[in-house]
């Protein structure tokens, strides 16, 4: 059985305290390669232990965090934030798994996350559905066909393979302030 996209609802025991702690941090990391703003600081300690223990139980192995990426950092995407389809772990030496934890109560459900078919898979998809691959790539934003997706639900963790094409789903961000924005925490890791 392949496990490539996993959704866990009610992930944290106390998401409100994690959210409160996250909102007290500075969202001071702006990068061209990352939508919105991230914290340069992380929350670890007891929070890291809880996350690690639960992911270990779900995936059945030791968790090795990829600290070269934004593990345990928080990200805010407000209304109007531009996003794009990308791979969270494009390099060979980066973590095999990625995770997004949604931390906004009563969010826009369409601001979840989605994984997309590669160009090669899109070609096969178009053929299988009786569409012309040559014209369908333009119609589907250069071949952007969602393979798997999950809506934004408070305290939902979505785990997926970091080497697949990923994008915040239909709505990239929402809210006009940090408190009302699409607040997430990201994780990057391997399982041994």
Predicted region positions:
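Non-heme Fe(II)/2-oxoglutarate
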Residues: 1-85, 112
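Catalytic core of non-heme Fe(II) oxygenases with the double-stranded beta-helix
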Residues: 79-192
């Amino acid at each position: 059985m392949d496990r490539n996209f996993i959704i866990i609802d009610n992930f944290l025991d106390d998401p409100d305290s994690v959210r409160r702690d996250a909102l007290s941090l500075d969202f001071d990391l702006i990068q061209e390669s990352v939508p919105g703003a991230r914290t340069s600081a992380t929350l670890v300690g007891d929070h890291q232990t809880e996350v690690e223990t639960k992911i270990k139980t779900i995936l059945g192995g030791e968790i090795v965090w990829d600290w070269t990426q934004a593990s345990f950092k928080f990200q805010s995407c407000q209304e109007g934030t531009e996003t794009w389809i990308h791979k969270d772990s494009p390099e060979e030496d980066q973590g095999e798994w990625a995770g997004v934890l949604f931390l906004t109560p009563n969010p826009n459900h369409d601001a979840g996350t989605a994984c997309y078919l590669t160009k090669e898979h899109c070609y096969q998809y178009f053929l299988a559905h009786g569409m012309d691959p040559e014209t369908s790539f333009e119609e589907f934003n250069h071949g952007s066909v969602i393979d798997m997706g999950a809506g934004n639900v408070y305290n939902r963790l979505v785990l997926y393979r970091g080497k697949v094409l990923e994008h915040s789903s239909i709505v990239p961000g929402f809210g006009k302030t940090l408190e009302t924005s699409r607040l997430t925490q990201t994780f990057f890791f391997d399982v041994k």
